[in-house]
């Protein structure tokens, strides 16, 4: 049994179909240190922006029935997969950036605990979610982003991975696409 098989599989609700060839808006979000990062920048690196609902913390309970929500579980695993393949991604001229609706402090704790070498941004005010019309779900009166990944080159979304069904294999799909494009 793969790791992904223990998680509820999300259905394709077509909520991200509009994102391919979308121009990244001129929005800056705070990273885990509270420093703002512009997402519409022109870099030599492609950006792999992966959106996730939330990472759990050892000292805090998950929202009630979290494990029953399709696509909710697996954010720590996904982040660790990007972390473990960071050098390969950089070698393919791509830099990962994680984004959730969690606070800067929450992101800081997670990046320190998991030793994440890249930026994890907070869209706590839902600026990017609203600008891109990102798919979300609601739990206990809080909005969470659904898991998806965008590959951005020259401010334009070139590839959309959504829904992400096999979390433990997703990094392989990203690496394959980067090698072929």
Specify the residue positions occupied by each region the protein language model found.
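Chalcogenol-based redox active-site neighborhoods
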Residues: 1-181
């Amino acid at each position: 049994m793969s790791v992904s098989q223990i998680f509820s599989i999300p259905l394709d609700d077509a909520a991200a179909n509009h994102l391919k060839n979308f121009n990244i808006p001129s929005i800056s979000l705070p990273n885990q240190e509270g420093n703002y990062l512009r997402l519409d920048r022109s870099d030599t690196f492609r950006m792999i922006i992966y959106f996730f609902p939330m990472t759990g913390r050892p000292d805090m309970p998950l929202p009630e029935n979290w494990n029953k929500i399709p696509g909710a579980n697996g954010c720590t695993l996904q982040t660790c997969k990007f972390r473990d393949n960071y050098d390969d991604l950089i070698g393919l001229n791509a830099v990962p950036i994680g984004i959730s609706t969690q606070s800067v402090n929450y992101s800081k704790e997670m990046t320190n605990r998991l030793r994440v070498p890249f930026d994890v941004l907070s869209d706590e005010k839902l600026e990017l979610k609203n600008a891109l019309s990102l798919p979300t779900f609601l739990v206990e009166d809080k909005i969470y982003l659904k898991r998806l990944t965008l590959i951005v080159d020259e401010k334009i979304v070139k590839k959309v991975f959504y829904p992400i069904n096999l979390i433990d294999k997703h990094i392989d799909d990203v690496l394959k696409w980067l090698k072929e494009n």
